[in-house]
Amino acid sequence: MKAQPKASHFIGGAFVEDKAGKPLPVIYPATGEEIASLYSATPGIIEAAYAAALKAQGEWAALKPVERGRILRRTAEILREKNRKLSKLETLDTGKALQETLVADAASAADALEFFGGIISGFNGEFVELGGSFAYTRREALGICVGIGAWNYPIQIAAWKSAPALAMGNAFIFKPSENTPLSALALAEAYKEAGLPDGLFNVVQGYGDVGAALVNHRLTAKVSLTGSVPTGRRIMAQAGEQLKHVTMELGGKSPLIVFDDADLESAIGGAMLGNFYSTGQVCSNGTRVFVHKNIRERFIERLVERTRKIRIGDPFDEATQMGPLISAAQRDKVLSYIKKGKAEGATLACGGGVPKLQGFDKGFFIEPTVFADVTDTMTIAREEIFGPVMSVLEFSDEDEVIARANDSEFGLAAGVFTADLSRGHHVIGQIKAGTCWINAYNLTSVEVPFGGYKQSGIGRENGIAALAHYSQIKTVYVEMGKVDSPY
């Protein structure tokens, strides 16, 4: 099974190769086999990307917003036309079940392109009357923006970052995760087919040193990262030295609160979506599931029943509901957290091991795992695991669970399940998290902002807010009379 692209990088509207770069093997997580071989960007590749972006950006920014938007919307159409092909590529790249990639990856990328392509013509400055004279503001492009992606949603992240940047008139250079470098190249081809001028969307591959080179480049106006908190801190420090704009979408250890009046099956479904989708590799996952003591036993019993029915196996079988983790290293990390959970006294309700799957013995699979009797101080309740491991904690009253939910360095997301919408709104109003749900979980519509509080990030993806983060404001004062000067 192979997925070798035409070349490692996409610069100035064309595939580009430089075999002097460090080899970058692409591994299919379900089997452990190498499906492609790429090369990390050399300094020459990086400079070529900036030269192409610089050449194209000014003319692009001068276009009418509606003209820029038209190209983005055409790109969305192309992604939808090729959704099945792109979904298969994403499954090869990530190991995620095709059942999932068909609806959640290229499809979400298309949604973002369609949204920003449509709304950009209405994203304007403001007019301020000043008693005869007046002022107005202009929203202007930043210049060349850099995106650094994660390996859980490669094409979605590439589009979520590039769509608002391009809509605002910026040029974009994207570095995918070294684990999942393929689908960003497919997005670049879609942009090209849609008529995006050469040089506006460039893809450079590489490891952390390439990301650092992009962050520190003198022509970089903004950096948008999806990644871990430690990586975010390093990039913030580097960008801060040159006062570059940043958006940081980082990790989480989000609370999901289930009150005793909640619809039990819906709450369990939400908890499973918030822990097992993408094999648990979702930054906003609600991995701390707080369940009211009155329904705790019923909740866990039914949760375990449903979790044991999750179908694990061949990601290309559309009946498969869960694929492997991204790598052997990630699987070993998750298994180490499961070991810690048991050692610290949590009850392993189900899962916790490596399934035996015929034909996939070298894949990076792990069973969906549920821990009960978890306390707030346990490692599995404090640290982001990034795998299919759910911690169920018991609570007895509203004020208590709000305080415990907020007792975290993270603040990316939160959810509440209750039949009392008044209580739902009240609780969410007290939770320190940037993206919240009531009677749902992990639904991320591109029309609304996505991002976190505290250590979970700075800035927002999606919604009109994202356009603000890819632009700068110019204020213009217009004097309608004579200048009144004491000199």
Curated annotation (Swiss-Prot):
Pathway the protein acts in: Amine and polyamine biosynthesis; betaine biosynthesis via choline pathway; betaine from betaine aldehyde: step 1/1
Keyword annotations for this protein, in alphabetical order, are:
Metal-binding, NAD, NADP, Oxidation, Oxidoreductase, Potassium
Write down what this protein is called: Betaine aldehyde dehydrogenase
Q: How is the cofactor bound?
A: Binds 2 potassium ions per subunit.
Entry EC no(s): 1.2.1.8
Residues the record lists as Cysteine sulfenic acid (-SOH) modifications = 283
- Give the signal sequence positions: none
**GO MF annotation list:** betaine-aldehyde dehydrogenase (NAD+) activity; metal ion binding
InterPro entries named among the record's database cross-references = Ald_DH/histidinol_DH, Ald_DH_C, Ald_DH_CS_CYS, Ald_DH_CS_GLU, Ald_DH_N, Aldehyde_DH_dom, BADH
What is the gene name?
betB
Name the active site residues: 161, 249, 283, 461
Q: How does it assemble?
A: Dimer of dimers.
